[in-house]
């Protein structure tokens, strides 16, 4: 009995010491070592899978998911590091900044998938003037959020180093997260509007009435497919393509879980660095770690490269509310079933570069600023 008691006390001793440490950056909470090491392994596996999927499907937007994986691994390395030293600012910033901004890149990839889906189902289902507008508007919003969070994180780091108040940095950081949450809320409304139009409105159009009843569920997608864009009917109707058939559901799960996680992060910062949420790790485990894991695993199984036949099918994003092939004097000479891997790879590469040029460059600048912050802080200590 005494041995068991001693072992228990021995395992709790580091946590008790940390709780008594007034310099703790976690309000006395010690990040769980086993959990965070497990998350490093899980995210390492997911990261590897997405790299392989990028090579297999040559789907360039896998890079957005790869960026998320790298940041998640770095973030959990920071939390593991903090387990042995809860007062270490480098470990805390690595954890806080990387895990906070990681979803930005996943959402950047998701925004682009909506543009692809509008191309597949038809431009008339787009609420915005162009399918690509979804990517541009929301990726730009994420860039603003990312920059504001970077400024807030930098101000907090400098304030802690100088021994001054972090209030200003906290407020700026919260503003950045609030922009991200507001942007995602708007995207969710547009996403559900799109789903309503392709699943409910087309059935109303098919039966020429607007009943609100479960009878609509009896109408199969095959029956209403003639109301979608004919050019990509092969993607929608092939019976064995279960990845595409459930892709919209997978997207919904991913967006809702990431939105839940971002709301939690915003609430965590509003409550404060020593508030109830940040000092109780179970909230982080369920509302952050689990939510991001569900979103990423879902997008790994229902990968866009498989859903859209990334190696063999070209789905260029085009402007306007009307499908290009229906416009007068439009020569539809593109072979959408072109089996040339190199041609499709070039198309996806150009689309990726056009949509992700600014997020990638901003991310590089952001990480450079963080590195400079760490470097200057270490020099100040010396």
From Swiss-Prot:
Top-level lineage group? Eukaryota
- Keywords in UniProt for this one? Cell membrane, Glycoprotein, Lipid transport, Membrane, Transmembrane, Transmembrane helix, Transport
Give residue spans on the Extracellular membrane side. 1-34, 79-90, 157-171, 263-281
Kindly summarize what the UniProt induction comment says about this protein's expression: In response to loss of mitochondrial DNA in a transcription factor PDR3-dependent manner. Induced in response to altered glycerophospholipid asymmetry of the plasma membrane in a transcription factor PDR1-dependent manner.
Pfam families in the record, alphabetically? RTA1
Which sequence ranges are listed under topological domain Cytoplasmic?
56-57, 112-135, 193-241, 303-382
Where, subcellularly, is it found? Cell membrane
- Which cysteines pair up through disulfides? They are none
What biological-process terms (Gene Ontology) are attached?
A: lipid transport
Question: Protein name, please?
Answer: Sphingoid long-chain base transporter RSB1
Q: Which organism is it from?
A: Saccharomyces cerevisiae (strain Lalvin EC1118 / Prise de mousse) (Baker's yeast)
